[in-house]
UniProtKB/Swiss-Prot annotation:
The gene is rplE. This is one of the proteins that bind and probably mediate the attachment of the 5S RNA into the large ribosomal subunit, where it forms part of the central protuberance. In the 70S ribosome it contacts protein S13 of the 30S subunit (bridge B1b), connecting the 2 subunits; this bridge is implicated in subunit movement. Contacts the P site tRNA; the 5S rRNA and some of its associated proteins might help stabilize positioning of ribosome-bound tRNAs. Pfam families: Ribosomal_L5, Ribosomal_L5_C. Part of the 50S ribosomal subunit; part of the 5S rRNA/L5/L18/L25 subcomplex. Contacts the 5S rRNA and the P site tRNA. Forms a bridge to the 30S subunit in the 70S ribosome. It comes from the Bacteria. GO terms for biological process: translation. One of its GO terms (molecular function) is tRNA binding. Signal peptide: none annotated. Belongs to the universal ribosomal protein uL5 family. NCBIfam families: PRK00010.1. GO terms for cellular component: ribonucleoprotein complex; ribosome. This is Large ribosomal subunit protein uL5.
Amino acid sequence: MADKYEPRLKTEYVSRIRGAMQEKFSYANVMMIPKLDKIVINMGVGEATADSKKPTIAAGDLAAIAGQKPVITKARNSIAGFKVREHMPIGAKVTLRGERMYEFLDRLINIALPRVRDFRGLNPKSFDGRGNFAMGIKEHIVFPEINYDKVDQMWGMDIIVCTTATSDDEARALLTEFNFPFRH
């Protein structure tokens, strides 16, 4: 029987990145070494007020990108200025953990981000103070799973990379080891 498949970045984390982090921060315990916890992808669909089918279409694209069925997000309260009613579908989100998380991260770093127009690197200040990194992508068509010819509308998305790191410096070092393209 063939060996169980393991994502490339997970193998790299176990074999190389953990050792590099241990060496850099000299942790007393192996369990103190930061690791990736989850990746949350959120798509807010502003046009949902005009057409209630838009969040469903966005969720289909998000499912193709993430490889997992997203949850349709609904408005918590009504905002008359934006023509939003309570419980109206306004977007989609998905939380990736485990192997799907590593697979998505690999595609994001090596395929999607280099395809972004005028990409000069990720902002190294986009950490939240607790070891989590957030970024936004303006066009979802940079992912190879999306067929450019079949897309009638482009949506942006927020991508939050959650780590077990306790500080921004640890998280920045971890993501740099994963070859995140931070600008200098």
